[in-house]
Amino acid sequence: MGQEIADNRFSEEDFIAFSERLKRETVLLGEWLRDGAFPRSDHVGGFELEAWLVDEAAEPAPINDRCLEKINSPLVVPELAKFNLELNGHPVTLAGDALSCLANDLKRTWSSCNALADEHGARLAMIGILPTVTEDHLNPQNMSPLKRYKALDEQLFKLRGGKPLSMDIEGRERLSFVHEDVMLESATTSFQIHLKVDVDKAVRFYNAAKLLSAPMVALSANSPYLFGVDLWDETRIPLFEQAVYVGQSELTKRVTFGVRYLEHSIMELFEANCERYPVLLPRLMDEPEERFAHLRLHNGTIWRWNRPLVGFNDQGVPHLRIEHRVVPAGPTVDDCMANAAFYFGAVHALAAMEDPPEGHLPYEQARDNFYNAARLGLHAEVQWLDGRRGGLGVLCEELLYGLARQGLEALGIEPSEIERWLGIVERRLNSGQTGAVWQRGWVAAHGRDMRGLTEAYLERQASGRPVHEWGI
């Protein structure tokens, strides 16, 4: 969840003071990590789901303020655009029936929000990119009235020297256009999977999350169209990267897969934040250094596809989390939770291997795997740990599915839970029908009618049946 700021106007002194506090907090975090200030904990998982509000014409409905007034829940918060909401869940220890607990939590919140949206002639949609969104919807008038969003827009374009964004995405077709504000980011909605990790295992889990980014984005792909143009299976990836591009080097991209694996400590990421990334939101906060307020705010303006997070529980005890951001929203709650189950299991299995698997796949290949998977989905050809090259769908079926099962068993997830959630993944792999495949199939059968596609998608989403069961 984002942090609100008191003002969107900053002086040079604000940037200098913020940078000094950021440096001190970064040094302190390094000391805490070395000195054991982060206690060991159970494996805990959670999520954030970004959703669309959609009107009777199946177009974005900029009414999140009206819905939020009625919802009045800390679990539901605004997003960048007035037509988006963020739904959060209660974190749970990953054992027993944890996956069903997470799913039921999301279903309750989803149902409540949908009922309130209905009072305003709208409904919720979970999808990577809404097919009916147009560039006209992505304008500053539809920006949520929070100062952090206005400040983010101003500071990003200040880093760009005021130059507009030149967008160019080439997939099955090509889309090029120019845009003059940060609102393009709001067209990308995701299901972010959170995992609490111990400090001494953070490097292994982080590198495992990177290895899994290619299969996860292919398995969950749900964003083939932008402005009616057929692009990548998961067009959300290049769109988000280009939407906040500041025109600098690979080392300072604000949305990034990164430049290497971690070697010794999760601190390598926070040190990179401090050393390489210009401050965007220099809000000065009256907080003790031990709360890492400036470090956490700055980290929130760097959108790594796998992002480290520092958090605190209600008793003020610190913890580390890894936020896996590659998965799009939808198509249904059950699809989302099946994706989470696959990730939780596979990342634990990879991180527990005696021989670190990242040592068997060059970083550049892991990066190329990720972008190929986002472009081509389960049909992408990738290289895996044993040097073998092949289709991602085959890799998921023959190797990663078993690893995910092994990891969930080691966590103590109930056998019936494993069968339920990984069974959805297995049947999706067998059918080959991801959200992206279904959307393209519908268009092939019915024509490029984005409203018709969205209505058909929402009808099937409302059934609750996972996407592999959807008919065209």
Segments the model singles out, each with a brief description of its role:
Residues M1-I472:
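Phosphate/nucleotide-binding catalytic core
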